[in-house]
């Protein structure tokens, strides 16, 4: 769906009499941009999941959040079913943000700031950290002439299985079995990368 709305990355080109401002920028730039607008009548919306609605308070006192639980890039566009998390500093701000979010996705949830902080933590765990572990596996594969593609079925299986069962119940592997011999062998294989050894040990202890 295409919205006929002005978009700019130039602060000097910001329309000064708009009724809604959506700050889809780096978290650290939101407050500064909001201070350039200072339009109390407008609804100011940012997309930073781990930040308070007050991040845009420099512009006015009607503030909200619409946060997509999805890694959006120029080449990866969001689907209509992706979760959009809504919050606001008043019932009116929440309602308006919900209306906008529902025009984009059919999966809109309202969470308060405390809940959003924990959800943001969870998103980092399942997305950023999981991706980093796969990046390590890819590098190990490359260093030892192994086709990383071999791991795709088990990667996909892991993502599919947790739709029906708790990840905690599905946990397997040497750490779960307390197979110290296998874990020691793995640590030896990672001897060239002490930081990976440390991560392996920490994760194994947590399991």
Regions inferred by a protein language model and the residue ranges of each:
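Predominantly flavin-linked oxidoreductase catalytic cores and closely associated redox partners
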Residues: 62, 69-78, 89-90, 140-143, ...
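Rossmann-like NAD(P)(H) cofactor-binding subdomain of soluble oxidoreductases
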Residues: 3-77
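Interdomain hinge/lid region at the active-site interface
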Residues: 158-207
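Short alpha-helical
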Residues: 28-29, 51, 91-92, 116, ...
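Internal alpha-helical scaffold of NAD(P)-dependent oxidoreductase catalytic cores
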Residues: 2-6, 78-163
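Amphipathic, non-transmembrane alpha-helical scaffold segments
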Residues: 22, 123-126, 130, 200, ...
